């Protein structure tokens, strides 16, 4: 996933993105590191909306 790159492009820090999506900053960090997490489609949709991209762009 390209969460870190997309987040930085939007000039958001992890806490700001987490607040917009309704998850913890720690979970954003795990997503960005590629930790063994399996976000739901609902969460991917919220992330994509917050980052102003499609879900497909998010998971490329």
Q: Each PLM stretch: what is its role?
A:
Residues 4, 15, 45:
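Short glycine-/small-residue-rich flexible loop motifs, especially phosphate/cofactor-binding loops
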Residues 42-57:
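DNA major-groove recognition helix of helix-turn-helix/homeodomain DNA-binding modules
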Residues 12-30, 35:
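Short alpha-helical DNA-recognition segment
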Residues 1-9, 56:
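A short, Lys/Arg-rich alpha-helix, primarily the initiator
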Residues 6-7, 33-36, 47:
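Generic anion/oxyanion-binding catalytic loop in active/binding sites
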Residues 8, 19, 49:
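Alpha-helical residues within the helix-turn-helix
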């Amino acid at each position: 996933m390209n969460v870190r790159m997309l987040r930085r492009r939007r000039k958001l820090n992890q806490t700001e993105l987490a607040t917009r999506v309704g998850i913890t900053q720690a979970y954003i960090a795990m997503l960005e590191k590629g930790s063994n997490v399996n976000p739901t489609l609902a969460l991917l949709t919220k992330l994509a909306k917050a980052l102003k991209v499609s879900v497909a762009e998010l998971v490329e």
